[in-house]
Amino acid sequence: ARGNATLPGPSEVDLRRLPAPKGTPASLADAGTPGSNNFAVSGALTADGRAIVADDMHLGLRAPNVWLRARLRWPDPDAPAGQADVSGFTLPGLPAVIVGSNGHVAWGFTNSYGDYMDWRLETPCPVDGADDGCAPAVRHMEQIEVAGGAPVAFEVLETAWGPVMDTLDDGRALSLRWVAHLPGAINLGLADLALAADLDQALAATDRTAIPTQNLVIGDRNGRIAWRLLGPIPVRDAGCPQRLPLPG
């Protein structure tokens, strides 16, 4: 029948027939490798014709927790039947549900593990002037508030390529360019997914969305599913090395 997958029986899959792994239980313990997974099932394979979306971002538990479950409801002429109603997980202060469903579409993210960063070896100019061949740099002094203690000053050195992440013994610095740091790479277009009535509207909303690049799956109540990378992708010159830092 539609949506009823045939599961293998014990005559086909019996884990007791497999050889026992060698070693002690302690040596065989899971190392806890980080990861995440998601999938979408077309309505052609489900019992009622609606798509199924599953998403496990493998995020750790904290106290206080960073991710919160939430349901948002408000009247909106752009929402189905004029009423937005979305449930899922979000971050405090963000006016959008990051992953969830509005009853018409459901969506989920995992890390895309793409190559979105480029490093550059540079020699930042000294504070008291500019040397030949050095990279002009700006120093930002950030103040980090500490609960129950005095604030901590944190200096960030930034060149035209990006923030300096490390300094080598010879004085050269590794600066980072990440597509998510570029102008226009981040916006709140994700909030429009709450108003989508079907897959086409959801994909149109993602066309207007800019976040650090994620692996996105979507499904709708009509049984349609989609996958795409959501977020900016770097456009590199042909001679740009991808395995080593760019020379300064």
Give short role names for the model-derived ranges.
Residues 1-248:
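Mature extracytoplasmic enzyme cores
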